[in-house]
Amino acid sequence: MNLIYQDEKVSSYTDEIIRGSGVVEIQLIKNELTIFNLDDTVYEKITFKNDSYYLENSLSEIVARKVILAMDFLSLEFDCKKFEEDDEFVYIFINKELMKIKNNNYKLNYYEWLDYVAGCYIKILRGNLLLIQTEYGERYAHNSEDAIFSVKEIVDDKLFLKSTSTGCCVATKNLEGVVTWREGDKLLVDICVID
């Protein structure tokens, strides 16, 4: 788990395990997010008001795909089960447990895993270096660790990557190659890069 957001109320971590069939991005309609346990009791209610937020049940740690509660950078992304537009609930994973939110209370964007990863910036992690092609054959690029890449193509568990040229994430290395992005349900790269 990598820490992606922290303030005086809560710490938010990204999950290294892939859960569900995809990721749901939640956009608030009424300045609040209510997450229910499976028995319909309230797990947590986050209310946003006056550039701040309030936690009804004082949740201090969040493990999800990407949760940033700062109003200027608000992001609410959760691994989820696939859902239909007319389903009453959307089943999401938070703190490694299955919970639910009411479908019609939010504007939701659903991404299958491959589509979600294709739109992410990728950070190479130690022990899973980028494999590059050189004039002498293939080799692992030791300077790829912690470098940031954009996704060119996904084939099964392989990502074909190119170093970013957008100015994002202070990219200074000009690299491209392939990396294994998952092993079963475990992520082998960081897909939650925050610039």
Outline where the language-model segments fall.
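Beta-loop motif signature
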Residues: 1-84, 115-156, 194-195
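Contiguous hydrophobic, core-forming segments of folded domains
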Residues: 73-101
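SH3/SH3-like beta-barrel fold
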Residues: 90-94, 159-164
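Non-catalytic propeptide/linker segments at domain boundaries
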Residues: 103-120
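Disordered, low-complexity tails and leader-like regions
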Residues: 156-160, 172
